[in-house]
A protein has these predicted regions:
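Compositionally biased terminal segments of proteins
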Residues: 1-149
Length: 149
């Protein structure tokens, strides 16, 4: 994935997550591509840890990114099964507080840290990504699972 070029907004958002020390993992299509099956994706999926300090940091990063809406409060990032969407495909950013089949703490401990297009990024590991795809059961996730090494 070393040759992947991230859209400027995605790069900026990842930089802000890093600057604010957010505990996050890149998941979804970008992680699938990183781990060996490059495919089209309509968004960038970011999974964040549910913790008060992390929630505060996520909100700070969002505000600095320009997503400063009254309904985007720390409490959203303290609840499971929440998704915050910004933008429209193919430039949509999605922030998730939980995903199928895996726990954040385990995945963060086993994360892959790499530099993509000049930005240090925390990615879900291949094995945990496969567990997530299998648990999701969606057609596109099962297809990803078949294509991943």
């Amino acid at each position: 994935m070393a040759t992947t070029h991230l859209p400027p907004d995605f790069k900026e958002f990842l930089q802000l997550l890093n600057v604010h020390s957010v505990r996050y993992l890149l998941i979804g299509g970008y992680a699938v591509g990183y781990h060996g099956y490059p495919r089209a994706t309509v968004d960038m999926d970011i999974w964040v840890a549910i913790h008060p300090d992390n929630a505060r940091r996520v909100v700070m990063a969002l505000k600095e990114f320009g997503f400063d809406l009254p309904e985007v409060e720390e409490t959203i990032f303290l609840q499971e099964n929440k998704v915050i969407r910004m933008g429209v495909p193919p430039m949509r950013l999605e922030i998730l507080t939980s995903i199928s089949g895996v726990e954040f703490a385990d995945c963060f401990h086993e994360r892959v840290v790499d530099v993509i297009d000049g930005i240090q990024v925390n990615l879900i590991s291949l094995e945990r990504l496969k567990e997530n795809k299998k648990a999701s059961g969606r057609y596109k996730d099962l297809n990803d699972l078949e294509q991943l090494p």
